[in-house]
Curated annotation (Swiss-Prot):
Listed name of the protein: Phenylalanine--tRNA ligase beta subunit
Amino acids binding Mg(2+): D327, D333, D336, D337
Cofactor(s) needed: Mg(2+)
InterPro entries, sorted: aa-tRNA-synth_II/BPL/LPL, B3/B4_tRNA-bd, DNA-bd_dom_put_sf, Phe-tRNA-ligase_IIc_bsu, Phe-tRNA-synth_IIc_bsu_arc_euk, Phe-tRNA_synthase-like_B3/B4, Phe_tRNA_ligase_beta2_arc, PheRS_beta_core
Gene (UniProt): pheT
Disulfide bond residue pairs: none
Main localisation: cytoplasm
Length: 553
């Protein structure tokens, strides 16, 4: 969950009608947000982190304007070309590959609106931007930027100097990471990188993303024109973050201008306000919610939730998703908003027609027992997404793509384009995201992996695995084998456990073995190779094992 603190009088002004605070709190609760705190005119709401569009006064005002039918659906801000180009140099690709942005003019800042913008910026960093690693926003005074060609480059840390925000000292990039408070907080994002990303104009550097901006382009109450730039590891993420910021400024009357983002191999026109369509059947909505709504009923409810309905038949609707709703991934997400607009409190509870008694499956009980054992062995439990990037499973693990992975035809992002075939890459993601934390880092996961199998009815075989990684200075084969032996002993399988020498591209030759229970191969154990560790940016040794949990029955 995330929190958003807003000024209540400013919110009412943005909504356009006089609403009591109690009424706002009531509606916010119905729509899934609770009131966390009230201090005078300052009200803090708790919102789910997937609703990044609600992390500002403007976002909440926009939602309430639609809910009260002041402005149903959504509109696309009129875009005009700015004449600015954002040129991406090829050397940034291994450092921080993506950038996007826009020009905003006719901004009329007040104390509240500038505070709201900065608040939104930081909330996006902490949620959607994954603490600036996946995406980060930079806001600049356009009048201080020289020239109409802006360059996104990567340079050595000691090659350029600038005066960062919250400082009067001329500093190199390395100095910023070592001594500036923001550099200390966020230097882990660039850990292991040989070059540092910068954004420059005709006068030189004015942004060190995702760390801090230059003092030269600082935004003040007297700023009327803005450059919004975002950098990150995923283009879709930063495009959505940009849209959220732009729609907030648009609600306050600003004008949006496009820029050309010139990559070495293509040119993108940003912002991208293209609308996605989702087809939804009336019967599907009613089956999920247990209601008897008609197509016109659903259309009216969706418009109150900020959607547009492009086409309606007697049994279907074509729904247009706003450019800032990154959380809408499936038609069930649309149904959820129908339910919120209808009011879940207005749905009459009923007992299912077939009575039954719920209980844990044997597989779930086994998984829980394994978790308890691994925790007792001093390892920390992790829960990772079953979707992962192909590069994480194959490229970074030094493995050839054998064609057995289940690929997603329309992935949310490149980091989630296949179903994982192993748990170890998921654990490596956790380790690579925690390079700034103390060691040892001994973690494990019990979870599902999958691969294509024509013998299965679905064409896919799913298997529950347990995997463990040890990451510290003395982590080695013997240390990880002790964990494996202790796990097997706890389930009465120690006498059947065998580790047979094997070769595997992810592991160091001579320090890798197959895990066998009886005569059946059920897993792998060993020390990860330096090639793998380097690809993840990990400098500590890592030892790991992974096996099927069914072998412990």
């Amino acid at each position: 969950m995330a929190t958003v603190t807003l000024n209540y009088p400013d919110l009412v002004k943005l909504i356009g009608i006089d609403l009591s605070l109690d009424k706002v709190r009531e509606v916010m609760f119905e729509l899934g947000s609770e009131t966390e705190d009230i201090q005078g005119d300052e009200v803090t709401f708790e919102v789910t982190s997937d609703r990044a569009d609600l992390l500002s006064e403007e976002g909440i005002a926009r939602m309430l304007r639609a809910y009260y039918s002041i402005e149903t659906g959504f509109r696309i801000p009129k875009l005009q070309p700015s004449g600015y180009k954002l040129i991406v140099n090829r050397e940034v690709e291994p450092v921080r590959p993506y950038v996007t942005g826009a020009i905003v003019r006719n901004v009329q800042f007040t104390d509240e609106s500038i505070k709201s913008l900065m608040h939104l910026q930081e909330k996006l960093h902490g949620t959607f931007g994954r603490k600036r690693k996946k995406g980060a926003v930079g806001v600049h005074d356009l009048s201080k930027i020289k020239g109409r060609e802006i360059h996104y480059r990567a340079v050595p840390g000691d090659s350029v100097k600038f005066v960062p925000l919250q400082s009067d000292e001329l500093m190199t990039l390395s100095d910023v990471l070592a001594r500036h408070p923001k550099g200390i907080d966020y230097r882990y994002v660039l850990e292991g990188k040989n070059l540092m990303p910068i954004i420059t104009d005709d006068e030189g550097i004015f942004s060190f993303p995702p760390i801090i901006n230059s003092k030269r382009t600082e935004v003040t109450l007297n700023t009327h024109d803005l450059l919004i730039e975002l950098t990150g590891e995923d283009l879709r993420t930063i495009d959505y973050m940009l849209n959220i910021v732009l729609y907030s400024l648009d609600l306050r009357g600003a004008s949006i201008y496009s820029i050309d983002v010139v990559y070495p191999d293509e040119t993108l026109h940003r912002p991208d306000f293209n609308v996605r369509n989702i087809d939804i059947e009336v019967d599907y909505v009613n089956r999920v919610l247990g209601l008897e709504l008609t197509a016109p009923d659903i259309k009216a409810l969706l418009e109150r939730m900020g959607f547009k309905v492009a086409e309606t038949g007697s049994d279907y609707l074509i729904v247009e998703v706003p450019p800032y709703r990154a959380d809408i991934l499936h038609k069930r997400d649309v149904v959820d908003d129908v339910g919120r607009a209808f009011g879940y409190n207005n749905i009459t509870p009923s007992y299912p027609n077939t009575p039954s008694v719920g209980k844990l499956t044997e597989a779930t009980k086994l998984g829980d027992a394994i978790r308890n054992t691994m925790i007792g062995l001093g390892c920390q439990d992790t829960f990772n997404f079953i979707l992962i990037g192909k590069d994480e499973v194959f490229g970074k693990m030094n493995l050839p793509d054998d064609g057995t992975a289940v690929e997603i035809s329309n992935p949310y992002a490149e980091q989630y384009n296949i179903v994982r075939t192993s748990l170890i890459p998921s654990l490596m993601i956790v380790l690579s995201n925690n390079l700034h934390r103390d060691y040892p880092q001994n973690i494990f996961e019990v979870g599902t992996v999958a691969h294509l199998d024509s013998a299965e009815n679905t064409g896919v075989k799913e298997i529950d695995h347990v995997a463990c990684t040890l990451c510290y200075a003395k982590a080695g084969f013997n240390e990880i084998k002790v964990k494996l032996q202790s796990l097997c002993a706890n389930f009465g399988k120690l006498d059947e456990l065998k580790t047979v020498a094997a070769e595997h591209p992810s592991f160091i030759p001579g320090r890798c073995a197959e895990v066998r229970i009886g005569d059946k191969k059920v897993g792998i154990i060993g020390e990860l190779s330096p090639v793998v560790l380097k690809s993840w940016g990990i400098e500590m040794p890592v030892a790991a094992f992974e096996m099927e949990i069914a072998a412990l029955k």
